From Swiss-Prot:
One of its GO terms (biological process) is translation. It comes from Chlamydia abortus (strain DSM 27085 / S26/3) (Chlamydophila abortus). It comes from the Bacteria. Belongs to the universal ribosomal protein uL24 family. NCBIfam families: rplX_bact. This is Large ribosomal subunit protein uL24. The keyword Ribosomal protein applies. GO terms for molecular function: rRNA binding; structural constituent of ribosome. One of two assembly initiator proteins, it binds directly to the 5'-end of the 23S rRNA, where it nucleates assembly of the 50S subunit. The keyword Ribosomal protein applies. InterPro entries: KOW, Rib_uL2_dom2, Ribosomal_uL24, Ribosomal_uL24_CS, Ribosomal_uL24_KOW, Translation_prot_SH3-like_sf.
Length: 113
């Protein structure tokens, strides 16, 4: 499996789709399908049938997953492109480079979910 810079809890920027330009927090990562669920993005309406608990039935809004290639990590409110940098001791780090300066983001092995 390819490394992914997006983890649960990260703030991401949506690059493509109906919600292009929106930002949201990653709720879950579906690594097998290369998809992520982002809070407030790609919201779908689901109808719940009538039952004893719900005599009238109801509609609920749920976030549907979107492909990971359609999101990019948001750092300082803007989409950021990250690269992997290997330090002298062999540790791999996600590195943000902009305007020729490098900024460490986090370790590659550090996963929140």
């Amino acid at each position: 499996m390819k490394r992914r810079s997006v983890c649960v809890g990260d703030t991401v920027y949506v690059l493509a789709g109906n919600d292009k330009g929106k930002q949201g927090k990653v709720l879950s990562c579906l690594r097998e399908k290369n998809k992520v669920v982002v809070e407030g993005v790609n919201v779908r309406t689901k109808n719940i049938k009538r039952s004893q608990e719900n005599p009238k039935g109801k509609r609920i809004n749920i976030e549907a997953p979107i492909h990971i290639s359609n999101v990019r990590l948001s750092i300082d409110g803007a989409p950021a492109k990250l690269s992997v940098k290997v330090t002298e001791n062999g540790r791999e780090l996600w590195n943000k480079s902009s305007d020729g300066t490098s900024k460490l983001y986090r370790s590659v092995k550090e996963r929140k979910g």
